[in-house]
């Protein structure tokens, strides 16, 4: 509620031809978009979600690999390939997708 009042005051202030004070803009921005810590983006959370899908948390490939002798994923020094499933990547990194992943969706 406090942010709405400040924004209305700021709008009236600018409409009258005054210069907008930068410290007030910064204060409104900080209160309107509060920074919450991590939101489940820690390395532990990424590894947990990747394990849940059966994927590597670094390169998003299937891990453990089906054919270990030809796999490029060692789960330690691997990097994502040219094309990878962006839905899998988004779920592992951010934890939220448009559709909650289910083992039957053939990721």
From Swiss-Prot:
Keyword annotations: DNA-binding, Host-virus interaction, Inhibition of host innate immune response by virus, Metal-binding, Suppressor of RNA silencing, Viral immunoevasion, Zinc, Zinc-finger
Recorded GO MF terms: DNA binding; zinc ion binding
Biological processes per GO annotation: regulation of DNA-templated transcription; symbiont-mediated suppression of host innate immune response
Annotated segments matching region Basic: 46-49
Pfam families: Carla_C4
Keyword Zinc: yes
Zn finger residue spans: C4-type: 56-78
Family: Belongs to the carlaviruses nucleic acid-binding protein family.
Known function: Suppressor of viral-induced RNA silencing. The potential mechanism of action is based on sequestering siRNAs.
Protein name: RNA silencing suppressor
Taxonomic placement: Viruses, Riboviria, Orthornavirae, Kitrinoviricota, Alsuviricetes
């Amino acid at each position: 509620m406090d942010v709405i009042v400040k924004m209305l005051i700021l709008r009236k202030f600018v409409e009258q031809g005054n210069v907008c004070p930068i410290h007030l803009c910064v204060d409104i921005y900080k209160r309107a978009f509060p920074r919450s810590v991590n939101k489940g983006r820690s390395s532990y959370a990424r590894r947990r979600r990747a394990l849940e899908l059966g994927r590597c948390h670094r390169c998003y490939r299937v891990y453990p690999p089906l054919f270990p002798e030809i796999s490029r994923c060692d789960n330690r020094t691997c990097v994502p390939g040219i094309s990878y499933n962006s839905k899998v990547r988004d779920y592992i990194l951010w934890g939220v997708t448009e559709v909650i992943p289910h083992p039957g969706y053939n990721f």
